[in-house]
């Protein structure tokens, strides 16, 4: 089934060229089906790139999905035009009276700051508190996962001696859990972060279950036992070239970032990286949408 998006969203043309099934509002109303309403809180600087990455996988499931984009009122985006934000994004005041079947909270390049020093932290806390009663399940990505662990479960992040940057092998810990159905026992996922969370703190928390970890990258995938919160500390949604683009960007800014590990063939940035996590991203999104959103959400909120 398709994702339902605004007719003029720039990502629409890109996705259609990739043979991703997208549908605009005019066509969607002709189908007698209630779509899943998914809210995406996009905290990434390059919002259009993140939109495309997420929609690529949200559109690859048997479910019709209606997408709404959310931005922060307490933060001014420097890398996305005001026109794009005003056209395609809502503010929290505009959506907080509604119910959503699922929500995605993306990463954000603010991990060097304590949570309380992030300019939109209070607003994000309000959104996360609101989600407890108004969203069936939330998928948190990278810094968004760390923010959720801190806010909901009191588990803080800590700084790494060097950036966790590359594609790492992960071990599946609970293969019979719904979220990881179809996953291989070992699989790859990209990471790009300067901070981490403690495996021991997660394993000791009675409301959390660690589902996948890496010897080199640490915690990767975990969930609350009630299914309300799914957290991925890496970026399965990244395209094959994203880490290369981040590496080049850092060096253009004078940041001496190491070559991403296990990424470029022969560690040569001139060579095309291998895309070896795409199928597991598809599984993660389809399992989340099916088992944690579609199967759990009421057909009509209030029932």
Curated annotation (Swiss-Prot):
<keyword id="KW-0012">Acyltransferase</keyword>
<keyword id="KW-0486">Methionine biosynthesis</keyword>
<comment type="similarity">
    <text>Belongs to the MetA family.</text>
</comment>
<feature type="binding site">
    <location>
        <position position="249"/>
    </location>
    <ligand>
        <name>substrate</name>
    </ligand>
</feature>
<dbReference type="InterPro" id="IPR005697">
    <property type="entry name" value="HST_MetA"/>
</dbReference>
<comment type="pathway">
    <text>Amino-acid biosynthesis; L-methionine biosynthesis via de novo pathway; O-acetyl-L-homoserine from L-homoserine: step 1/1.</text>
</comment>
<dbReference type="GO" id="GO:0019281">
    <property type="term" value="P:L-methionine biosynthetic process from homoserine via O-succinyl-L-homoserine and cystathionine"/>
</dbReference>
<dbReference type="InterPro" id="IPR029062">
    <property type="entry name" value="Class_I_gatase-like"/>
</dbReference>
<dbReference type="Pfam" id="PF04204">
    <property type="entry name" value="HTS"/>
</dbReference>
<feature type="active site" description="Acyl-thioester intermediate">
    <location>
        <position position="142"/>
    </location>
</feature>
<keyword id="KW-0028">Amino-acid biosynthesis</keyword>
<feature type="binding site">
    <location>
        <position position="163"/>
    </location>
    <ligand>
        <name>substrate</name>
    </ligand>
</feature>
<feature type="active site" description="Proton acceptor">
    <location>
        <position position="235"/>
    </location>
</feature>
<feature type="active site">
    <location>
        <position position="237"/>
    </location>
</feature>
<keyword id="KW-0963">Cytoplasm</keyword>
<feature type="site" description="Important for substrate specificity">
    <location>
        <position position="192"/>
    </location>
</feature>
<dbReference type="GO" id="GO:0004414">
    <property type="term" value="F:homoserine O-acetyltransferase activity"/>
</dbReference>
<comment type="function">
    <text>Transfers an acetyl group from acetyl-CoA to L-homoserine, forming acetyl-L-homoserine.</text>
</comment>
<dbReference type="GO" id="GO:0005737">
    <property type="term" value="C:cytoplasm"/>
</dbReference>
<dbReference type="InterPro" id="IPR033752">
    <property type="entry name" value="MetA_family"/>
</dbReference>
<feature type="site" description="Important for acyl-CoA specificity">
    <location>
        <position position="111"/>
    </location>
</feature>
<dbReference type="GO" id="GO:0008899">
    <property type="term" value="F:homoserine O-succinyltransferase activity"/>
</dbReference>
<keyword id="KW-0808">Transferase</keyword>
<protein>
    <recommendedName>
        <fullName>Homoserine O-acetyltransferase</fullName>
        <ecNumber>2.3.1.31</ecNumber>
    </recommendedName>
</protein>
<feature type="binding site">
    <location>
        <position position="192"/>
    </location>
    <ligand>
        <name>substrate</name>
    </ligand>
</feature>
């Amino acid at each position: 089934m398709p994702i339902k998006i605004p007719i003029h969203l720039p990502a629409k043309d890109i996705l259609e060229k990739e043979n991703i099934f997208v549908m605009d509002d005019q066509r969607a109303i002709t189908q007698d089906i209630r779509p899943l309403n998914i809210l995406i809180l996009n905290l990434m600087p390059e919002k259009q790139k993140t939109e495309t990455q997420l929609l690529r996988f949200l559109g690859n499931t048997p479910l019709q999905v209606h997408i709404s984009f959310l931005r922060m009122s307490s933060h001014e985006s420097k890398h996305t035009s005001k026109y794009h934000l005003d056209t395609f994004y809502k503010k929290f005041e505009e959506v907080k009276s509604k119910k959503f079947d699922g929500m995605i909270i993306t990463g954000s390049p603010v991990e060097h700051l304590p949570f309380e020093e992030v300019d939109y932290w209070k607003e994000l806390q309000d959104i996360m508190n609101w989600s407890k009663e108004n969203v069936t399940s939330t998928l948190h990505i990278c810094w968004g996962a760390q923010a959720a662990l801190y806010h909901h479960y009191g588990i803080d992040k800590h700084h790494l001696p060097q950036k966790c940057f590359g594609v790492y092998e992960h071990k599946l810990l609970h293969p019979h859990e719904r979220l990881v159905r179809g996953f291989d026992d070992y699989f790859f996922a990209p990471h790009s972060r300067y901070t981490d969370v403690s495996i021991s703190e997660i394993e000791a928390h009675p409301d959390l279950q660690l589902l996948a970890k890496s010897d080199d990258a640490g915690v990767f995938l975990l969930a609350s036992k009630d299914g309300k919160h799914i957290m991925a500390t890496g970026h399965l949604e990244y395209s094959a070239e994203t880490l290369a683009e981040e590496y080049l960007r850092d060096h253009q800014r004078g940041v001496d970032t190491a070559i991403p590990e296990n990424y470029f063939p022969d560690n040569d940035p001139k060579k095309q990286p291998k895309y070896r996590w795409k199928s597991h991203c598809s599984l993660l999104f389809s399992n989340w949408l099916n088992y944690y959103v579609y199967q759990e959400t009421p057909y009509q909120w209030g029932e």
